């Protein structure tokens, strides 16, 4: 649950397709304005599948984030999210955005501007580069690859 919102049943059958496309369109447009710098994503208590850690037939390790992916410029914020569930696995993705592979900076419109959020569109690929341990947190250096087929609303209609 994110920020206290319940499971899918609370949507009363509405899957918010138009809203999802509108948000995605904003990310596609605004990501072009985001400075290519390092961002972090903290995950608490989650277990990634074995297929994430083992190289596939092309020699690549990682996976695809099916949903919008929230990250932050602030490593401490990510570490706080990762350490949220005491006694459960703590993981932080550390990623360097590039010339093409960038998320949209949301601090200017966020209810939580101190989190310095950068949002990536659905279907962002995360390719594992290396890992290290920082205290009780596993830090995974990943290379993001944004979904280049994502269209803006103007392209869809």
Question: What are the language-model segments listed below?
Answer:
Residues 1-100, 104, 108:
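Internal glycine-rich, Lys/Arg-flanked active-site/core loops of soluble domains
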Residues 44, 72-75, 79-156:
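Active-site and NAD+-binding cores of ADP-ribose-processing enzymes
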């Amino acid at each position: 649950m994110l920020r206290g919102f319940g499971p899918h049943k609370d949507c009363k059958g509405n899957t918010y397709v138009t809203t999802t496309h509108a948000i995605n369109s904003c990310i596609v447009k605004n990501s072009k304005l985001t400075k290519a710098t390092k961002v972090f994503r903290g995950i608490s208590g989650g277990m990634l599948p074995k297929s994430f850690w083992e190289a596939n037939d092309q020699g690549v390790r990682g996976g695809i984030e099916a949903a919008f992916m929230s990250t932050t410029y602030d490593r401490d914020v990510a570490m706080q999210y990762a350490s949220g569930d005491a006694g459960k696995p703590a993981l932080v993705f550390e990623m360097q955005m590039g010339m093409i592979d960038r998320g949209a900076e949301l601090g200017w419109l966020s209810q939580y501007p101190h989190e310095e959020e950068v949002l990536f569109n659905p279907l962002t690929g995360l390719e594992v580069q290396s890992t290290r341990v920082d205290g009780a947190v596993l830090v995974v250096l990943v290379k993001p690859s944004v979904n280049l087929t994502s269209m803006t609303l103007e392209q869809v209609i």
